[in-house]
């Protein structure tokens, strides 16, 4: 029962915290879609070069 007030206070603080969308954008901000796209293209390049990754769908070394 002693934890209930602490839980309620934490819920109230979480609900009143500003969201990520409220933060101002800077020039250094990079959209996440480009980060994920770069990761996919790097992975495609690794698989295309024939590097073994230990599973059957990879190209042979």
From Swiss-Prot:
Q: Give the UniProt tissue specificity note.
A: Expressed by the venom duct.
Tell me the protein's name.
Chi-conotoxin CMrX
What intrachain disulfides are recorded? 52-61, 53-58
Which residues does the propeptide include? 20-49
Q: Where in the cell is it found?
A: Secreted
Give the lineage: Eukaryota, Metazoa, Spiralia, Lophotrochozoa, Mollusca
Q: Which residues carry this modification: 4-hydroxyproline?
A: 60
- Spell out where the chain crosses the membrane: none
Keyword Secreted present in the record's keywords: the answer is yes
MF term (GO), any? toxin activity
Keywords from UniProt, A to Z, are: Disulfide bond, Hydroxylation, Neurotoxin, Secreted, Signal, Toxin
Free-text domain note:
The cysteine framework is X (CC-CX[hydroxyPro]C).
Q: Which residues form the signal peptide?
A: 1-19
On the tree of life, the source organism's domain of life is: Eukaryota
| CC per GO annotation | extracellular region
Main localization (coarse): secreted
The entry's family comment says: Belongs to the conotoxin T superfamily.
Protein's job: Chi-conotoxins inhibit the neuronal noradrenaline transporter (NET/SLC6A2). Induces flaccid paralysis, when injected intra-cerebroventricularly into mice.
Where do the coiled-coil regions begin and end?
none
């Amino acid at each position: 029962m002693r934890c209930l007030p602490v839980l309620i206070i934490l819920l109230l603080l979480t609900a009143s915290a500003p969201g990520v969308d409220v933060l101002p954008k800077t020039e250094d901000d990079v959209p996440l879609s480009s980060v994920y796209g770069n990761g996919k293209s790097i992975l495609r390049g690794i698989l295309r070069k024939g590097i073994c990754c230990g599973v059957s769908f990879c190209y042979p070394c």
